[in-house]
């Protein structure tokens, strides 16, 4: 599907038709076909393996103060309501040395200790509530289950877990927090897992995957080490404006002097380990936990390219689920520091408008937003038009792209797409939008359907990928894309051109002179940025490991943020 040979390049006309027929259709066609009902799950990594050893000792539950129904001394405008509180229990991890067997009968009894784990309070109704202050003193270091929250839009999400970065093949042994049934409730526990990192990269160990039908705030446990010190949970007056609101009240601490080093929370391994952030409402009952990983290639040196306009961003995990809000906001914010002015999103799913929009506003980025057309055709995309019109944060939007290679993928014909673009433009205008609207297709589709499409769009949108032309090397990528610009301008006279997808893969099989590698990717991207970077959107932020391999096995490996 990637760009075509130029009609004017007579010297290579003999091979152009073969390239159009064979090379322009590849795994990119299924950019958003990631759900189980639309596409098979990503292939499992045969080199990864992991075993889990559960070594758990149950301890007393963490105590959380519960306000009584008697009037509080705090003066508020509403009556203080009794709090309905829940908490995660405190669990002490006891690791049995390798080769030894646990002897539960000989284990000494341990006195109950109250530890400063965060208080999780559920407010069933609106009102003003007071949580009294609490002070605790801890004299020994203990690994416990903390708690954190994250907001998830509707859909399938992967969150939590422990992230580790290794520089070579490494076996990592670390604790992770999870929940398991305990009678009619659930209890947080600390488990240990052994994970084999097959090569250098970043891995997420033991994340949780869940499905939420609507936008939800979940609470989930995280491993934490409580060190000796005095911890205070200050008095809090909370005004709750919606029903079933969950509030996490943390402790703040001052560490006590100590003459002995604090025991590490993980087995000594040449790796750095941190808890993965995330935020959401009551813990969904459909959650499942399995040790897994999300490897990525080591980052190449940054700062090689400048002068670029935009970057595509997809809010999906390596498994095809939706990323949490915290991850989306931090990743999008990085684009501004890399010199980008725009972020392009393809659809409205996974909180693309709300979460990416919030990140763009905070970071000072503009957005190129999209209406994605799938196999269901234009009728199935109307709800996205409605969602965008209701969102209506037009001060963030530079361009709306209706359809991404939908003609190339045979999801609709040119006349149907043109009619849908005109209809969508009317809806956006009625909602207050006065900016540009277009679609995006490879150059061969524009050449064949310009008569139908030119009148419907305000600017010509094209996906130009020099890799899929076998006679173009990485060093020639910039000149090739610039020539495609000239050809496209001749299709719709008087209208500008924007390159909405361009880049170069870093892994896969060679396509003639087009060779995928980290080095060639860096060369190609710099060449494109030098020629047409100010009117190009680079593809893509990360590798898309949830995709099928596609033509030349490159479809998953276009991540290029390290080059900027």
UniProtKB/Swiss-Prot annotation:
Which Gene Ontology molecular function entries are recorded, alphabetically? glucan endo-1,3-beta-D-glucosidase activity
Question: Active site: which residues?
Answer: 405 (proton donor), 501 (nucleophile)
Query: Keywords on this record?
Result: Carbohydrate metabolism, Cell wall, Cellulose degradation, Glycoprotein, Glycosidase, Hydrolase, Polysaccharide degradation, Secreted, Signal
Reaction(s) catalysed (UniProt annotation): Hydrolysis of terminal, non-reducing beta-D-glucosyl residues with release of beta-D-glucose
Taken from the UniProt entry, a GO cellular component term is: fungal-type cell wall
**Keyword Glycoprotein listed:** yes
EC number(s): the record gives: 3.2.1.21
Which BP terms in the Gene Ontology apply to this protein? cell wall organization; cellulose catabolic process
Stored Gene3D superfamilies:
Glycosidases
Glycosylation-annotated residues: 404
Q: Where in the cell is it found?
A: Secreted, Cell wall
Q: What is the protein's major site of localization?
A: secreted
Q: What segment(s) does the record annotate as region Disordered?
A: 285-304
Position of the signal peptide: 1-18
Pathway note = Glycan metabolism; cellulose degradation
Summary of the function given for this chain in its UniProt record: Beta-glucosidases are one of a number of cellulolytic enzymes involved in the degradation of cellulosic biomass. Catalyzes the last step releasing glucose from the inhibitory cellobiose.
Q: Which family does it belong to?
A: Belongs to the glycosyl hydrolase 17 family.
Name of this protein: Probable beta-glucosidase btgE
- Underlying gene: btgE
């Amino acid at each position: 599907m990637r760009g075509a040979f130029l009609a004017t390049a007579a010297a290579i006309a003999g091979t152009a038709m073969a390239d159009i027929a064979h090379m322009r259709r590849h795994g990119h066609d299924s950019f958003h076909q990631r759900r189980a009902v639309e596409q098979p799950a990503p292939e499992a990594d045969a080199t990864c393996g992991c075993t889990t050893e559960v070594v758990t000792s149950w301890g007393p539950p963490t105590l959380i103060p519960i306000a009584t129904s008697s009037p509080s001394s705090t003066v508020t405008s509403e009556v203080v309501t009794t709090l309905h509180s829940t908490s995660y229990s405190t669990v002490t991890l006891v690791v049995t040395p390798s080769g030894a067997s646990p002897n539960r009968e000989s284990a000494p009894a341990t006195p109950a200790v109250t530890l400063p784990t965060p208080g999780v309070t559920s407010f069933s109704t609106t009102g003003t509530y007071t949580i009294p202050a609490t002070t605790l003193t801890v004299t020994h270091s203990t690994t416990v289950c903390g708690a954190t929250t994250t907001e998830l839009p509707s859909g399938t999400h992967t969150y939590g877990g422990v992230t580790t970065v290794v520089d070579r093949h490494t076996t990592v042994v670390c604790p992770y927090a999870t929940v398991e049934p305990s009678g009619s409730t659930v209890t947080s526990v600390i488990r240990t897992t052994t994970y084999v990192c097959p090569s250098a990269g970043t891995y997420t160990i033991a994340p949780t995957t869940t499905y939420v039908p609507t936008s939800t705030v979940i609470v989930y446990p995280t491993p934490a080490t409580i060190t000796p010190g005095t911890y205070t949970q200050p008095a809090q007056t909370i005004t709750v404006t919606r029903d079933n609101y969950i509030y996490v009240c943390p402790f703040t601490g001052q560490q006590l002097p100590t003459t002995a080093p604090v025991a590490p929370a993980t087995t000594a391994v040449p790796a750095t380990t941190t808890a993965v952030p995330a935020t959401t409402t009551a813990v969904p009952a459909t959650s499942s936990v399995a040790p897994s990983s999300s490897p990525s290639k080591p980052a190449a040196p940054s700062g090689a390219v400048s002068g670029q306009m935009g970057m595509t961003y997809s809010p999906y995990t390596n498994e095809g689920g939706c990323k949490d809000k915290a991850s989306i906001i931090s990743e999008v914010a990085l684009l501004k520091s890399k010199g980008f002015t725009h972020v392009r999103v393809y659809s409205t799913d996974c909180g693309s408008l709300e979460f990416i929009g919030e990140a763009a506003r905070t970071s000072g980025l503009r957005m190129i937003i999209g209406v994605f057309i799938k196999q269901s055709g234009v009728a199935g995309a109307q709800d996205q038009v409605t969602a965008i019109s209701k969102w209506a944060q037009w001060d963030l939007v530079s361009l709306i792209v209706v359809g991404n290679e939908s003609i190339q993928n045979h999801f609709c014909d040119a006349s149907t797409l043109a009619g849908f673009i005109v209809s969508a433009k009317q809806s956006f205008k009625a909602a207050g939008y006065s900016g540009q609207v277009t679609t995006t297709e490879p150059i061969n589709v524009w050449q064949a359907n310009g008569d139908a499409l030119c009148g419907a769009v305000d600017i010509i949108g094209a996906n130009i990928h020099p890799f899929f032309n076998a006679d173009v090397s990485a060093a020639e990528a910039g000149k090739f894309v610039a020539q495609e610009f000239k050809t496209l301008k001749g299709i719709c006279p008087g209208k500008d051109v924007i390159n909405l997808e361009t880049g170069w893969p870093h892994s896969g099989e060679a396509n003639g002179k087009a060779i995928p590698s980290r080095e060639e990717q860096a060369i190609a991207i710099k060449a494109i940025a030098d020629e047409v970077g100010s009117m190009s959107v680079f593809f893509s932020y990360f590798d898309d490991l949830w995709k099928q391999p596609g033509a030349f096995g490159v479809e998953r490996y276009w991540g290029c943020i390290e080059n900027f």
